[in-house]
UniProtKB/Swiss-Prot annotation:
InterPro entries, A to Z: Herpes_gL_rhadinovirus (IPR020175), Herpes_gL_rhadinovirus_sf (IPR038313), HSV_GL_alphagamma (IPR034708)
Chain spans, region Interaction with gH: 23-128
Keyword vocabulary terms for this entry: Disulfide bond, Fusion of virus membrane with host cell membrane, Fusion of virus membrane with host membrane, Glycoprotein, Host cell membrane, Host Golgi apparatus, Host membrane, Membrane, Signal, Viral envelope protein, Viral penetration into host cytoplasm, Virion, Virus entry into host cell
Any one of the GO CC terms: host cell Golgi apparatus
Gene this chain is encoded by: gL
Span of the signal peptide: 1-25
Chief localization: virion
Location of this chain's protein in the cell: Virion membrane; Host cell membrane; Host Golgi apparatus, Host trans-Golgi network
Mode of membrane association: Peripheral membrane protein
Name used for this protein in its record: Envelope glycoprotein L
Matches recorded under Gene3D superfamilies: Viral glycoprotein L
Amino acid sequence: MRTVGVFLATCLVTIFVLPTWGNWAYPCCHVTQLRAQHLLALENISDIYLVSNQTCDGFSLASLNSPKNGSNQLVISRCANGLNVVSFFISILKRSSSALTGHLRELLTTLETLYGSFSVEDLFGANLNRYAWHRGG
């Protein structure tokens, strides 16, 4: 039964994560600590692409994108700690779990699976300087 659960979880993660690779030529990015004026407002974020920690040397990353006002053209993209982004959405979805639609319950399960796939062991072989936190403008 556990094998079937792992298989289904892998399929769901594949459905949600793999399509982002076609939209993102290089999924591994540097997480940068930004000044307040450069942060994306939550209501302006149009897309969030999660990257599996297996893709970027043990690092779980996310791309937060925002279009130009009144346009479909992507103009702002920020790299974030994917584990923090996943944790944030898990927390939000769990707070209203009794009112979730089927799609949101499926998303919650997928996010929990993605979160559960992260382990400290992944970092043992990682090049910790490659995607290090940088102070940005």
